[in-house]
Amino acid sequence: MFNHIRLGIIGCGWLGTALGSKLVRQGAFVKGTRTQAEKAKELMAFGIEGYPFQLKEGSWIGDLTFFEHINVLLIAIPPGLSTDQTSNFVAKITPLISQLKKYKLEKIICTSSIYVYGQAQGKLNEDSQCHPNKLSGLQLIEVEQALINNFPDTIIILRLGGLIGPDRHPIHRLRMRSRIEAGLNPVNLIHQIDVLAGLEKVLLTQKKQHCYNLVSPYHPIKEDYYSQLAYQWEIPPLKFDQQTKYPKKISSNRFVSDYDFSFIVEKLLIE
């Protein structure tokens, strides 16, 4: 099914490695980058050609042969502001855009985040106004627009909900807090299984529009969701503030319609 795909993944981490290894098993040729040479070599265990490659502000360090013999590129790197508040994601992506103009790629896919919506409230879709209240959201919007402006015929941006899956779930961070704020807010999450299924749809389907949300349609309030999960996983009871803060339910109806997509993980691990 994927024999015609020659995919390059910039940022072959938790999500990129899962996608790459799955596609390799289905006949695709996959290259992936990691920032360290030793970590890049580890990708061979998944059938992925590993390349050391690191984006810097205004430049990069790495092996540019990564870009040869691929027809699709996935950019799956976070802004990095959680570990470095001075990081300029826009300045890192700008030289990458210049490099990509040298190649004829059928599709460029970029994972973004629902952080771009920030203080926006209510039921939101891709046409809703973004009101980012964090630097990461502001920089993601700039990067999205730069990619759309430079690659209008090939770019597809996926704004992902909060990621959950193998060895990854917000509850492990939230359980360390004495009290969790905005307990009455709806959750906007997505399981790795559904992200991979969505990316497969994008790879196999003709491009429709520039930007899509990819968030589970299951939106219980935080208190109900995390309390039930804590019970299932035998985590001590969590405490929540009985209030909302920029509550929102983010819709993926556009993606579901354009790509004939059905979510696989219906209740985000709730049994």
Regions found by a protein language model. Give the residues of each.
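Conserved N-terminal Rossmann-fold NAD(P)-binding element of oxidoreductases
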Residues: L7-G11
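Mid/C-terminal beta-alpha module of Rossmann-like enzyme folds, strongest
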Residues: L196-S252
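Substrate-positioning beta->alpha
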Residues: L160-L163, H169-H172, I180-L203
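Conserved Rossmann-fold NAD(P)-dependent oxidoreductase catalytic core, especially the SDR/UDP-sugar
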Residues: T94-N133
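NAD(P)H-binding glycine-rich loop region in Rossmannoid oxidoreductase-like domains
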Residues: M44, I48-P95, Q99
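N-terminal Rossmann-fold NAD(P) dinucleotide-binding loop
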Residues: G16-T17
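Conserved beta-loop-beta element that borders a ligand/cofactor-binding pocket
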Residues: E142-P166
